[in-house]
């Protein structure tokens, strides 16, 4: 449909170097300031009274950390992953990075170094747009597999792999769909890719947010040979702390050593105070943050049931719902919601391979913000949607 505006708000410029989301955020900060209602983040927000105050050493700014990461943080990360997934990894299997995306960049380049040519990489779609951008910048030819269920079959993934495929990138719990895979899937996928010499890169930055007592199995539990396996994680989503810019990669000790050498060349080491705070934060745990998401999910579930039951349902994991709205021009709708209602939304433009007029509804904001944002969204849908 063509939106019938009283006043048309065109906020996004197609010729901008910035992402659509970043343009809307800048508009909200400069034009709306405190009156804007931000409903974009898939980073969960700590409840005010429960917000942690992680410890920072008074002397850690005066020294470089180890290029692999500060030992206290690596010990903490290793203990976390071993406890969560029943593993027996050691500190040598972990590398601290400047966030999850930096970890992916190191992994993609390290895999490329194994071959004279980059070859191709398989991505499940939709996928956060920065991931394929990184792969293409590294020299890979991208192959998309369009998701039609919570997770694909192993046969479907293998069917799109080519003779030159170097890696398969998976993101579970999935961003933005919120799906998780079965034990049988990962137990079959790991040896199947290994037989073909294809690396598996598993992005697990939402693994704290799997609900209803469900779990996923780590690929490291499926083999003793870790040379073709990489997992990437961070404190941004799982611990609600994107400002720390702390992530980690797990793989074989040889792979970790190679990536540590790359990291040393690029930035010497990751920020020492951030690592100290991250170790403290992970040790404290994220139970209040998890409960915040549980509470917000209940509000979003009720909203979807009342207003959008034809278009989306609550997924089993993650911190958002990807909703295909009944509008023809989703970017025009999002601009109008921002200009007229002050509601900042993230759309399908944030993802590659997304089909349809999607927005993401976050499930990690405090209840009051969630209620307010959903009411504004209801008004906008009632006024502009093709229903």
Curated annotation (Swiss-Prot):
Signal peptide residues on this chain, from the entry's feature table: none
Keyword set, alphabetical order: Aminotransferase, Pyridoxal phosphate, Transferase
CDD domains per record: AAT_like
Reaction equation(s) it catalyzes: (3R)-5-guanidino-3-methyl-2-oxopentanoate + L-aspartate = (3R)-3-methyl-L-arginine + oxaloacetate
Gene, per the UniProt record: mrsB
A Pfam family: Aminotran_1_2
Disulfide bonds: none
Designated name of the protein: L-aspartate:5-guanidino-3-methyl-2-oxopentanoate transaminase
Function: Aminotransferase involved in the formation of the rare amino acid 3-methylarginine (MeArg), which is used as a potent antibiotic against the closely related soybean pathogen P.syringae pv. glycinea. Probably catalyzes transamination from the donor L-aspartate to 5-guanidino-3-methyl-2-oxopentanoic acid, generating 3-methylarginine.
InterPro entries per the UniProt record, alphabetical: 3metArgNH2trans, Aminotransferase_I/II_large, AspAT/PAT-like, PyrdxlP-dep_Trfase, PyrdxlP-dep_Trfase_major
EC number: 2.6.1.126
UniProt enzyme class: transferase
Cofactor: pyridoxal 5'-phosphate
């Amino acid at each position: 449909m063509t939106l019938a505006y009283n006043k048309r708000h065109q906020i996004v410029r197609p010729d901008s170097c910035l992402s659509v989301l970043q343009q809307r955020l800048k508009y909200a900060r400069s034009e709306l300031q405190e009156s804007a209602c931000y409903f974009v983040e898939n980073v969960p927000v700590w409840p005010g009274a429960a917000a942690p105050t992680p410890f920072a050493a008074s002397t850690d700014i005066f020294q470089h950390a180890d290029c692999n990461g500060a030992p206290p943080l690596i010990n903490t990360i290793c203990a976390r992953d071993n406890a969560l997934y029943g593993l027996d990894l050691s500190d040598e299997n972990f590398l601290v990075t400047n966030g999850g995306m930096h970890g992916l960049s190191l992994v993609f380049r390290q895999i490329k170094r194994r071959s004279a040519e980059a070859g191709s990489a398989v991505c499940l779609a939709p996928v956060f747009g920065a991931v394929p951008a990184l792969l293409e910048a590294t020299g890979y030819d991208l192959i998309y597999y369009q998701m039609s269920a919570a997770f694909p079959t192993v046969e479907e993934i293998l069917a799109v792999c080519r003779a030159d495929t170097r890696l398969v990138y998976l993101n579970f719990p999935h961003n933005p769909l919120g799906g998780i895979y079965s034990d049988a899937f990962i137990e079959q996928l790991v040896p199947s890719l290994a037989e073909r010499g294809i690396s598996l890169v598993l992005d697990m930055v939402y693994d704290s947010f799997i609900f209803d007592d469900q779990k996923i199995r780590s690929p490291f539990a499926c083999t003793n040979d870790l040379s073709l396996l990489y997992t990437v994680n961070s404190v941004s989503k799982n611990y609600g702390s994107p400002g720390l810019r702390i992530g980690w990669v797990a793989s074989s000790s040889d792979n970790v050593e190679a990536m540590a050498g790359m990291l040393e060349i690029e930035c010497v080491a990751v920020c020492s105070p951030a690592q100290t705070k991250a170790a403290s934060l992970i040790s404290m745990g994220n139970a209040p943050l998890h409960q915040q998401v549980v509470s917000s999910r209940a509000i979003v579930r009720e909203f979807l049931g009342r207003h959008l039951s034809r278009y989306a349902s609550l997924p089993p994991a993650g911190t958002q719902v990807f909703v295909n709205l009944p509008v023809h021009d989703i970017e025009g709708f999002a601009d109008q919601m921002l200009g007229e209602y002050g509601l900042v939304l993230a759309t399908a433009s944030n993802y590659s391979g997304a089909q349809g007029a999607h927005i993401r509804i976050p499930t990690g904001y405090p209840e009051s913000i969630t209620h307010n944002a959903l009411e504004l969204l209801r008004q906008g849908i009632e006024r502009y949607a093709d229903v």
